[in-house]
From Swiss-Prot:
Its EC number is 6.1.1.20. The keyword Acetylation does not apply. It is found in: Cytoplasm. Its main location: cytoplasm. One of its GO terms (biological process) is phenylalanyl-tRNA aminoacylation. One of its GO terms (molecular function) is ATP binding. The keyword Metal-binding applies. It comes from Chlamydia trachomatis serovar A (strain ATCC VR-571B / DSM 19440 / HAR-13). The gene is pheS. The lineage of its organism: Bacteria, Pseudomonadati, Chlamydiota, Chlamydiia, Chlamydiales. Its cofactor is Mg(2+). Mg(2+) binds at residue 257. This is Phenylalanine--tRNA ligase alpha subunit. Tetramer of two alpha and two beta subunits. InterPro entries: aa-tRNA-synth_II, aa-tRNA-synth_II/BPL/LPL, Phe-tRNA-synth_IIc_asu, Phe-tRNA_ligase_II_N, Phe_tRNA_ligase_alpha1_bac, Phenylalanyl-tRNA_Synthase, tRNA-bd_arm. Pfam families: Phe_tRNA-synt_N, tRNA-synt_2d.
Length: 342
C-alpha cells in the first residue's frame, strides 16, 4: 500500500471515528489517536525520511493536507458537540417555574429606605407637588453656581465634594433639580425631588458618603414664610402619625434667605432620652425662603415671585421613625435588620 492509499484509508477511518464521537471526551480520544504524541500521524515521520528525495515534497504535502483535514474536522465537530452539551446542561439546570415555591423562600419587601422615600414623596404629591429627578453626575454650575454657592464656598472643596473632573461632581444634594427646573419652567412650580447624594465624609453611625435626600420647593406669587411653616407642620404630622411641635433655628444655606434648621418634638415629651440627646428636640430638615439670587439666575423676577425650599435626609427620617441608631445598618444587607420592615 502506497502512502497516498494509506492516507486515504486513514481519512475514511477518521470520518467513521468522528461520527461515533458524541461527547467532548470522545472527541478528545479521537484527537489523541490521530494527532497525539503516539498518534497515527507520528508514524509518517519515519516513512517520510525513507522516501526518495524527489518524492519527499509531494508526499510531505499529502501528509500535511490529510493532517490539516483531520484538525479542521475536529474543530468543527468540537463546536457542535460543545453547543449540544451546553444546551443539555442548561436544561438540567433550568428551574421549573411551574412547581410551587418553597414556603421557606418568602417574598422580599421594600428596603426601609425605599419605604420611607416613597412615603415622603407620596405626602408631597398629596400637597400638590410634582415629582422630578436629575442626574447623580452633575455640572458644578447646576450643583453650586446656580444655587448661589460662591466660588470660594467650603462645600466646593475636594474635602467635601467628589469631583470627577474640574467642572463635574457627584451631586451633593438633590437641589440640582431646583436649578434645572427653575431654568426650564416659569412659576408657578411645586416640585419634590428624591434621590441619592454623595459627600466626602467619614463613615460613622451618623454619616455616610452615600445618602438619600428629598428636596421640595415652591415658587409662585406671594409665597410667604408662613406657607413654608404650615406645610412643614402638616408634613410631619402625617409622616410621624402624631401631632408634633416644630422649632425653627436660624441657619445659613447659600440658596435660601432666611435659612432655618427644623426640629420636631421628641416622643419623650421633653423628659430627655438618648434619641434626642436629652434635649427634647430632633433635627429633621433645613429650609428657608429661596434666595433672590437663585431666582435671578433662573431669569425669575424676585420682585414678582417668591418661594421656599427645604431638604430632608431620608436616612435621618427613617432613623427617627423606627428608632434606628446606626446609619450603616441601611447598607449592610443584614436580613435580620431588613426583615423588620418588609
Amino acid at each position: 500500500m502506497t502512502i497516498q492509499e494509506e492516507l486515504e484509508a486513514i481519512k475514511q477511518q477518521f470520518s467513521c471515528d468522528v461520527s461515533l464521537a458524541h461527547s467532548s471526551k470522545d472527541l478528545f480520544d479521537v484527537k489523541v489517536k490521530y494527532l497525539g504524541k503516539k498518534g497515527i500521524f507520528r508514524g509518517f515521520a519515519d516513512q517520510l525520511r525513507k522516501c526518495p528525495i524527489e518524492q519527499k515534497a509531494t508526499v510531505g504535502a499529502s501528509i500535511n493536507a490529510c493532517k490539516q483535514y483531520v484538525e479542521e474536522v475536529l474543530l468543527e465537530r468540537g463546536k457542535a458537540v460543545l453547543a449540544k452539551e451546553e444546551a443539555e446542561e442548561f436544561l438540567k439546570e433550568k428551574i421549573d417555574i411551574s412547581l410551587p415555591g418553597s414556603e421557606e423562600a418568602a417574598l422580599g419587601g421594600k428596603h426601609v429606605i425605599k419605604k420611607v422615600l416613597d412615603d415622603v414623596v407620596d405626602i408631597f404629591v398629596r400637597f400638590g407637588f410634582c415629582v422630578r429627578e436629575a442626574p447623580n453626575i452633575e455640572s458644578e454650575k447646576n450643583n453650586f453656581s446656580l444655587l448661589n454657592f460662591e466660588g470660594d464656598h467650603p462645600a466646593r472643596q475636594m474635602q467635601d465634594t467628589f469631583y470627577l473632573d474640574p467642572t463635574t461632581v457627584l451631586r451633593t444634594h438633590t437641589s440640582n433639580v431646583q436649578s434645572r427646573e427653575l431654568a426650564r419652567n416659569k412659576p408657578p412650580v411645586r416640585i419634590v425631588a428624591p434621590g441619592e447624594c454623595f459627600r466626602n465624609e467619614d463613615v460613622s453611625a451618623r454619616s455616610h458618603v452615600i445618602f438619600h435626600q428629598v428636596e421640595a420647593f415652591c415658587v409662585d406669587k406671594d409665597i410667604s414664610f408662613s406657607d413654608l411653616t404650615s406645610m412643614l407642620a402638616g408634613f410631619y404630622h402625617i409622616f410621624f402619625g402624631r401631632k408634633v411641635e416644630l422649632r425653627f433655628r436660624h441657619s445659613y444655606f447659600p440658596f435660601v434667605e432666611p435659612g432655618i434648621e427644623v426640629d420636631i418634638s421628641c416622643e419623650c415629651h421633653g423628659a430627655g432620652c438618648s434619641l434626642c440627646k436629652h434635649s427634647g428636640w430632633l433635627e429633621v430638615a433645613g429650609a428657608g425662603m429661596i434666595h433672590p439670587n437663585v431666582l435671578r439666575k433662573a431669569s425669575i423676577d424676585p420682585e414678582e415671585y417668591s418661594g421656599y425650599a427645604l431638604g430632608m435626609g431620608i436616612e435621618r427620617l427613617a432613623m427617627l421613625k423606627y428608632g434606628i441608631s446606626d446609619i450603616r445598618l441601611f447598607s449592610e444587607n443584614d436580613l435580620r435588620f431588613l426583615r423588620q420592615f418588609s
